[in-house]
Amino acid sequence: MAEINKQSNKWEQEEVSNENNWELAEEESVDWRGRPSNPNKHGGMRAALFVLGLQAFEIMGIAAVGNNLITYVINEMHFPLSKAANIVTNFVGTIFIFALLGGYLSDAFLGSFWTIIIFGFVELSGFILLSVQAHLPQLKPPKCNPLIDQTCEEAKGFKAMIFFMALYLVALGSGCVKPNMIAHGADQFSQSHPKQSKRLSSYFNAAYFAFSMGELIALTLLVWVQTHSGMDIGFGVSAAAMTMGIISLVSGTMYFRNKRPRRSIFTPIAHVIVAAILKRKLASPSDPRMLHGDHHVANDVVPSSTLPHTPRFRFLDKACIKIQDTNTKESPWRLCTVTQVEQVKTLISLVPIFASTIVFNTILAQLQTFSVQQGSSMNTRLSNSFHIPPASLQAIPYIMLIFLVPLYDSFLVPFARKLTGHNSGIPPLTRIGIGLFLSTFSMVSAAMLEKKRRDSSVLDGRILSIFWITPQFLIFGISEMFTAVGLIEFFYKQSAKGMESFLMALTYCSYSFGFYFSSVLVSVVNKITSTSVDSKGWLGENDLNKDRLDLFYWLLAVLSLLNFLSYLFWSRWNIKSSRRNNTNVVGDENI
């Protein structure tokens, strides 16, 4: 232990405010051979750069597939528009559902590094199979233009099976890789070390920058390849990008500090719930100091220091009541510590914050489906010889963000730190709220543009330039920079030891629920607005000039505003319940 202190002091040459926690964090991390990590050799931004490389290449590959998938599904597989939109949203939603599996396997059994390696190859195999399926004519329906010929043969049977098998291999691999990329990079920093804590916040911004770079290349270069060289070549390039990402990760093996997996991450949570139920008839003591706080079980998923008692969810406090007049040691299924109970309370308090981002991601789903189709109905000509692929519209915010994110981290964050005293500059909960508020205006812009585009096409016979669609993508890009990064940082800093990857997976589940909700919303809106046999609803036609996409966007704008108001309530509740005991938590901020 003394040797670790010596190395840590030599590394930073400054006083560590919480030395015991720093030492414990170092003991819990190991190198690739399972030996205790050395702060002079392992971790830090140098190690995180290899993970950022993987993140850029992985998002490059998956974004090139996902963002142009609706065009492929309609033009090559011949699915109708509404069904194609649901295929895309279900695919993206499933990716983020699989994130839960990846987070669980990492925290409980494999560790983040090996989880990424194993499922990285699963994702790679899916890209390769997609490329083969797109290349061989016998694995696709006969060529046909669905906009001209209404009798195009839809992919069915063996052809559909191959397509969906490849698609969901990609979903399984990407889903299990995503939360572990973020967690593994963040694991290279210690929250208990003041300087490292600031670097952790910068890492989350750097991770979003890597994400933006990957998205930008995917939505420009890779989509251009798909459009001009064919989807088979495009899917092959995605496979090559994933290969480069795996190579980037493996190259950093010698520098990583890895956290050991901790058996079942759900058992300590179950201990608290079962103990509280078994003692439900007991009265909770008015003095929290009477609650049991010294019963620690080896390998329990608890933070390195104890958590103070909070008055929220008082029913769970009954799990800490020690039965009097007995000398026998109670089972962990009947007696828990205050820290264990408080950790479960924290997880429960994250639920409304998590739920508040679902509608936000439903809006994202529209930008990857209907907004791409909007672009297809507009004038894509940039010059006599160059047309903008509609899927490349989504590159618009990322072009801006590759400049905005470094400026945010270099200038706005230091300035905000002086005002707020928070290591992140703008605290995570505030950051989430800013993004949720801005997303409403993305849908307002989209609705106004669609009304103008439809009227120009139907009434005047004019086709608007594709540049009119820019504002809705720009506004949402800025909102995503605030909400997505804020949510990841908030969840990571609230997570218990050994649950980092799983909590990161929950942030991705917000994407999943958002995309699934989009599918449900489209179906419900179509059903409600289908007034007759001839009317298929707002989104039931394959022709946007006959659909009422503008009204659907207005509906989403209203839902987004209501969602923001709901978030204000729950975020204030989260802050208030945390401040009652003067706990120094990431959510202690003004909104």
Curated annotation (Swiss-Prot):
Swiss-Prot/TrEMBL GO biological process terms: oligopeptide transport; response to nematode
Tissue spec. comment: Expressed in flowers. Detected in roots and siliques.
InterPro entries (alphabetical): MFS_trans_sf, POT_fam, PTR2_symporter_CS
Keywords, sorted A to Z: Membrane, Transmembrane, Transmembrane helix, Transport
Biased composition (Polar residues): 1-10
Subcellular location: Membrane
Membrane-protein topology: Multi-pass membrane protein
Transmembrane segments: 47-67, 85-105, 109-129, 157-177, 204-224, 233-253, 347-367, 395-415, 429-449, 463-483, 502-522, 551-571
Main location: membrane
Induction, per UniProt: Down-regulated upon nematode infection.
Highest taxon in the source lineage: Eukaryota
CDD domains: MFS_NPF4
One Pfam family named in its UniProt record: PTR2
Region called Disordered, residue ranges: 1-38
Gene3D superfamilies: MFS general substrate transporter like domains
Cystine pairs: none
GO cellular component: membrane
GO MF annotation list: transmembrane transporter activity
Family, as annotated: Belongs to the major facilitator superfamily. Proton-dependent oligopeptide transporter (POT/PTR) (TC 2.A.17) family.
Name used for this protein in its record: Protein NRT1/ PTR FAMILY 4.3
